[in-house]
Amino acid sequence: MKKLILTCALMTFGLMAFAQSLNTLTAKEKKAGFQLLFDGKTLAGWHTYNKPGVIGNCWTVEDGVISFDMTKKERGDLITDAEFENYDFSVEWRISKNGNSGIIFNVTEDLKYGSTYNTGPEMQVLDNDGHPDGKIFNHRSGDLYDLIKSSSEPVKPVGEWNTARIVCNRGLLQQYLNGVKVVETRYDDANWKTMIAGSKFKNMPAFGINMKGRIALQDHGNPVWFRNIKIKKL
C-alpha cells in the first residue's frame, strides 16, 4: 500500500510539474532571446484575421491550451498582433481525427486579402490517415503546403502532441517536425517563384512575396489545439 501511495504521489507531482512547465521559457531559452507568444491563460497578442482587437469565440483557452471550436459562429484564423522578420518560431499542435489545420506565416493583413493563405505559406497540420488531403503528396503534415513534400514524416498519431518549428532567416526557410528537419528552401529566388507558378497559389499575386509578416493558426473547420508557442528574432 505504501508503494502504491508513493507511486501515485510521484505521478501527481510529475503531472503538476509538467503543467507548470507548459507555456514557459527555460533559462536557456530566455538567455537565447526567445519570447512567449502565448501566456497559457489568455489570447493577449492575438486577434482574428482582419479584425484587429477582436477574437472570435471559436478560439478559447483551457488548461493552458488554445482550442478551436468549429461550432461557434465567430470564425476566422487566429493571427499575431505583431509582425516578424527573420525568426525561429515553434508551437506544439494536436489535431482531431480526420482534421485539417495549418500554421501560416509571413502573412500580410489587409482587407483586400480575404484569407491568410492569400499571402502566407503554410506548414500543414493534418490527420494524414483520416483526411482526404493525406492522399495528396504535398498536403500532408509537415509539408510546405502545395509546394514541397516533407523529406520524412516524423508525425505522431492523431491525439498526440507534435512540435512544429519554422525558421525564416534572410530568405532561407527551414521547417522541422518533432525535431526533424523536413523542408528546406529559399523563399527569395527564382526557384521559389517557379514553385508558386506550379501551385494552387499561382493566381494569387501577393502569395509568398513577403520577407516578414504575421503568423496565423488556421481555422479549417476542424478541432485543433495549440500550446507552447515561442519565437526568437534572428
Task: Name every feature range the model reports, one short phrase each.
Residues 20-234:
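Carbohydrate-interacting regions of secretory-pathway proteins
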